[in-house]
Amino acid sequence: MSLDYLGNPIDTRNPATRQGLDDFVGGFLGYQPRAEGILAVADADPDSALANGFAGLLLMFIESPEGPVLAEKYRQRAAAVNSRHPRALVYLQVLQAWINDELDEVLRLSEHLLDLYPRDLLAAKLNQYLEFNRGNWPALLRIGLKATAGAPDIAHSHGLLAFAYEQCHLLEEAEASALEALRLQASEPWAHHALAHVMLTQGRIEEGIGFLEGVKQHWDGLNSFMYTHNWWHLALFYLGRGEDQRVLEIYDRHVWGILPEYSQDQVGAVSLLARLELAGIDVGERWQALAPYLQRRVGDAVQPFLSVQYLYGLARAGKPEADQLLAALRRHSVEARPVWGEVTLPLAEGLLAHARGDARRALEQLGIALPRLNEIGGSHAQRDLFAQVELDARLRVGDWLGAQQTLELRRRYDGLDVPTNRALVVVYEALGLPGEALRARARIGGISVI
């Protein structure tokens, strides 16, 4: 039996195809561009159902309405092989279900693959990706535990588990799993990412800066998502300490412009620009530079978490396509899963209102969406953007009571957070509490307090 580098059965003995399968799996797990070579490998070997199935899966990950259309070519080719290879057959079923938007079936089949082949970390990663997009964090943990049980010697499995623990708020377990991944492979980027989440959540800002600055050399050569996203996390740490110019430098050099056509690069840029503005920092013409790429998303309703950020970016750039995208989301919500109409639409309405300066409308709509934000996917750190927008709307309408409550709760996680304390100065002065305003100012280094 022919096996891949993890010990899973494959349907070819062709050396080039075998290498291509290994490059796809290893590159996918490690966020390396070599994974993209599976397209050429599949084109060169139409008799490998597995190679063509993997090529189709890769195209589904572009997170674009074009994905299923592009993937169908490889699905048809894989099906034409009439393979009897058990693993290839299940992957073909996975691809078919995903193209048909039958996500429950994709999840069932991918976990079935992991049960059949305990070292199939590709199946584990695919399952976690889809559950992540639906906010099912306990499912991530279940899959992560299976992955480490089947492949305890592979660093990527512990990275998968670490992030799952973190999203379940099991921070000590998350840190331990991330450190185990790094013991096995110091360059494991998903473990870097999981530890960044832990440190941010626990307010270990200086430690987070030191850690990420110490491992950033490992991100060179990774695919654009992992490269830009880990830099995005480093930018959040610097933003929390008021290092505004450093954040802008990171944005310009490491967050935007690596692969501007890609969905994750776009929402990372939108999110960081929005956070900069919410912190009172002028971002110049950066929204305008981002806008041409977002304008291509006017009909994009692939993932709610992505669509609402495209919309916010378009609105901040002053583009009419923001209204067109909102109309597309309304149309999609009629027949889509309930989360689109019940959470995504009010979130989109609220973000659009905020971007255009209607803070009261923003508060009204965001108040509907925020309690159920978990259902649209995105990590805790990513979804926090929407809470920050809602907080900014409170400040703009003069809801000092609500803002004070929110800000002091946020300060429990990081007492020295500069944007939080800047806002508290304004709030306490408005509330007639100059002593508290003085203390907030002191926390950002403005003055000393006796």
Question: What are these model-derived regions, one by one?
Answer:
Residues 26-27, 58, 92, 96-97, ...:
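Residue-level signature for tetratricopeptide repeat
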Residues 144-241:
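Internal metal/ion-chelating core segments
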Residues 14-20, 47-50, 84-90, 117-124, ...:
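Generic helix N-cap/helix-start motif at coil->alpha-helix transitions
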Residues 233-448:
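Helix-coil-helix junctions within alpha-helical repeat/solenoid scaffolds
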Residues 40-41, 77-78, 112-113, 146-147, ...:
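Canonical positions in the second alpha-helix
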Residues 28-31, 62, 100-101, 134, ...:
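Structural motif corresponding to the intra-repeat A-B loop/turn of tetratricopeptide repeats
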Residues 13-18, 23-39, 43-47, 52-88, ...:
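Inter-helical turn/loop elements of alpha-helical hairpins
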Residues 34, 70-71, 106, 140, ...:
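Single-residue signature of alpha-solenoid repeat helices
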